[in-house]
Amino acid sequence: MKKITVLTLGLLCAGLLGACSNQKMESEASTNDKSSMTTKKDSDQSSKMAKDFSLQGVDGKTYKLSDFKGKKVYLKFWASWCSICLSTLGDTNDLAKEQEGKDYVVLSVVSPTFNGEKSAEDFKKWYKSLDYKDFPVLMDTKGELLKEYGIRSYPCALFVGSDGSLAKTHIGYMSKEDIEKTLKEIK
């Protein structure tokens, strides 16, 4: 009986520690480009330029990073199964509402079929039932941005400077106030 209790507690702890961690990361991403992976919770990467991308949003529009040249970009990587991600969608929506006339834009990225995410069609149906309409949700259907930026857990925030440099990476929860502070601090 004691062994079963210890085993149950061990499994419970392991499950809690990995709540929003990616347990299905492709080995290709971990072996091919280790130079782009972030190993710290916060990372200053201002010398690296952010790679341009062209992704379709849930809204059907195509978004390119280069479309926002001259503005700071907050990129939120998240998943529909991540409870922390879901609990902060309201803050993300509020930041996007407030971006009018500011020097930044808010974009979010999901990767259908990667890391346990729903298919693109299932995700679109699910997302349309939510009430967060002020920020674009980009579909990284090939997982290219996940690989490029070494995204291994959710949520993950990338901050791109107005010059296109990758200014900061933050893994895990980030309050709206901390996001705003970071957007003010980067160039």
Predicted regions and their residues:
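Thiol-based oxidoreductase modules, predominantly thioredoxin-like and allied folds used
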Residues: 103-118, 134-142
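Conserved redox-active cysteine motifs that mediate thiol-disulfide chemistry
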Residues: 77-94
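Bacterial signal peptide processing site
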Residues: 21-23
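N-terminal "domain-start" segment that seeds a small globular fold
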Residues: 25, 29-65
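Thiol-/selenol-based redox modules, centered on thioredoxin-like
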Residues: 159-187
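Positively charged n-region of N-terminal signal peptides that target proteins for export
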Residues: 1-4
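C-terminal motif of bacterial Sec signal peptides marking the signal peptidase cleavage site
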Residues: 16-19
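Short, internal strand/loop/helix patches
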Residues: 123-160
